[in-house]
Regions:
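Switch/communication elements of ASCE P-loop NTPase nucleotide-binding domains
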Residues: 1-36, 274-420
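Phosphate-coordinating catalytic segments in nucleotide- and nucleic-acid-processing enzymes
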Residues: 28-311, 386-421
Length: 421
């Protein structure tokens, strides 16, 4: 994915599956990385709390311990985390161990305290940023695929995300629809985030979506709230948080003439707290706005809040849906402009209009070498599976595939003859 990646194909050809797998993979990395430092601190504080309870009043009775160990658990945590030098931290913990070993304690209490200190040391030495990646992948796969991820007829499926340096990658194996193994190698930073847009129609359902739970969070005993895949709630939360402040990204939106294309812009009404479409100082409920306008509104708000950027992937599943062919051309031009600005994008499509528009504007903006095309189609040896092959240099294969349904109904005269017979 060196710019814009386009996966074309007919319905039920596996296009969306590819997009969702990529979303799960990147989102798992992002979520785990964001939580790793917070989790490490939380676990450390819990371990320090146990240690302090175990030592009890000895902390205050022993002059040495009173001098070495801060009064509060939080202060102790900050002290340990601030010791970036491994040797200094180890010497500090060893000093505490030596003091404890000389105090009059029962063998069991002394042993438990030593175990606590050992756990604290292990937590501090944990340098893996992705230690909980397996659980995160499992939750996201359950959310997106509802326990039906493994290839039909196969016991296991494997996924690998390779990075540009050729050394960093995320690999995981799913066995019987559960994450069996997961590992991250290399130190390259993957991506800051990913946003998956399935439909712009969700704009007028924001409040309902935000009140719903994501799949992994759902309590099976609670039926009052809806259950939604991660990518839908993720997009809704991002759109809802979009601000109206002028940022560099907002200028990008202005340069792309988004407001001119739709003759207005989307913004949150501070009085009602709801999203509105503004045109000529008149506000309209999102539900009353054309679907095509909503699509450009999604891009506008994602740009304005920096939700998509040169290191935040945008995935859009069949953006041409509910859109007039002329607006498909406008949207294709915007996507190419984003590509030229350095934004990584993955698009799936079954529209020859949209595909040709991407091809045309890629040439017009001189970014053809940064656009890769793939065709998803049923596997010849297994109708239950699909294959995805690169067709950047053989795009006619795609147009033939997408045009085939229309070709079947082009000859009206032939249809009349059949009726006459």
């Amino acid at each position: 994915m060196n710019g814009l990646t386009v996966i074309a194909g007919l319905n039920d050809s596996g296009k969306s599956t590819i997009g969702k797998v990529l979303f799960v993979t990147i989102k798992a990395l992002v979520n785990t990385l964001h939580r790793s430092s917070n989790n490490k601190e939380r676990i450390l504080l819990e371990q320090i709390s146990t240690l302090y309870e175990r030592i009890g009043e000895l902390r205050f009775k022993s002059e040495q311990l009173n001098h070495m160990m801060p009064i509060t658990i939080e202060a102790m945590g900050r002290k340990l985390l601030a010791m970036e030098n491994l040797e200094s931290r180890q010497n500090y913990l060893n000093d505490i161990i030596n003091i404890i070993s000389k105090e009059e304690l029962t063998p069991r209490v002394r042993s438990l305290i030593m175990t606590d200190l050992s756990k604290i040391n292990s937590t501090l030495n944990e340098n893996s940023r992705f230690y909980d990646i397996k659980t995160e992948i499992n939750d996201l796969l359950e959310s997106e695929f509802l326990g039906s991820f493994t290839t039909v007829g196969e016991e296991t499926s494997e996924v690998t995300l390779m990075m540009e340096d050729g050394k960093s990658n995320l690999y995981y194996k799913v066995k019987e629809n559960k994450t069996d193994t997961a590992s991250v190698t290399g130190q390259e930073i993957f991506l800051d985030d990913v946003t998956y847009v399935e439909s712009s129609l969700y704009l007028h359902m924001l409040q309902s979506i935000l009140r719903s739970r994501k799949m992994p969070e759902a309590d099976p005993m609670v039926m009052a709230r809806g259950l939604l895949p991660e990518h839908i709630v993720d997009m809704a939360e991002k759109i809802h948080s979009a601000s109206r402040r002028m940022t560099v990204a907002d200028k990008t939106a202005a340069e792309m003439n988004l407001a001119k294309i739709i003759d207005g812009k989307f913004a949150f009404d501070p009085n009602s707290g709801s999203l509105k479409f503004q045109r000529n100082e008149v506000s309209f409920p999102v539900m009353n706005v054309a679907s095509g306008i909503k699509s450009f509104g999604v891009i506008q708000m994602l740009l304005e809040n920096g939700i998509i950027s040169n290191n935040r992937l945008l995935e859009w599943d069949e953006p041409e849906n509910h859109m007039h062919p002329e607006w498909q051309l406008n949207l294709a031009e915007v996507m190419i402009q984003l590509t030229k600005a350095g934004y990584p994008i993955l698009i799936t499509t079954h529209s020859p209009y949209f595909l040709q528009a991407l091809r045309y504007f890629a040439a017009m903006y001189d970014v053809e070498k940064f656009v890769d095309y793939y065709l998803a189609e049923p596997a010849k040896d297994n109708a239950a599976t699909c294959v995805v092959r690169e067709v950047t240099d053989t795009l006619n294969d795609v147009f033939i595939t997408l045009a085939e349904p229309l070709n079947r109904v082009l000859n009206v005269d032939q249809a009349r003859k059949k009726e006459a017979e």
